[in-house]
């Protein structure tokens, strides 16, 4: 990148993006099972597509830990549970996207996630005016959360 801001085209419509181990990971959210995640490498001033992976529907956040486990935040709707889906690695996720190693139920409207220092940090959109006040005319969130949820991965993998 030469300037403060650069623009790069990707092959899939981003619903969430993360950077891990020198790779840009871009997932596409669909309510049905046609979701994909594509990995990209930045090389010689260009973003080069590396590989495509199948992922479960409704993915809104991606994170990786030091063991290359994949954490996906999946959510759709203000009154449906969200889930943190955990896979051993990207190959396990690609092979069986509907069969995570572990699945943790969370409140509705989970969005982006981040992994740092043994914790998963989860953002929720349920306290935004659209969901909290129902400004879109589709009702209010049943469980508005205006905090970041922290999940200690030692409670998942003791």
Name each region found by the language model.
Residues 21-22, 85-102, 114-117, 157:
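Flexible "stalk/tail and boundary" regions
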Residues 24-27, 69-72, 120-122:
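Conserved beta-propeller blade signature
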Residues 53-94:
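Loop/turn-rich, solvent-exposed surfaces of beta-rich toroidal or solenoidal domains
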């Amino acid at each position: 990148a030469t300037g403060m801001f650069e623009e790069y085209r990707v092959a899939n419509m981003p619903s969430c993006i993360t950077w891990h181990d020198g790779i840009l990971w871009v997932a596409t959210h669909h309510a049905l099972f046609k979701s994909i995640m594509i990995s990209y490498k930045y090389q010689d001033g260009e973003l080069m597509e590396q590989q495509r992976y199948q992922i479960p529907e409704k993915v809104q956040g991606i994170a990786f830990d030091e063991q290359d486990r994949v954490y996906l935040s999946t959510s759709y709707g203000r009154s449906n549970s969200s889930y943190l889906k955990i896979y051993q690695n990207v190959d396990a996720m690609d092979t069986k996207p509907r069969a995570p190693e572990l699945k943790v139920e969370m409140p509705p409207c989970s969005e982006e996630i981040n992994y740092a220092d043994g914790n998963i940090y989860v953002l929720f959109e349920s306290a935004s005016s659209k969901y909290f006040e129902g400004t879109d005319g589709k009702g209010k969130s049943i469980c508005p959360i205006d905090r970041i949820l922290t999940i200690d991965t030692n409670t998942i993998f003791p």
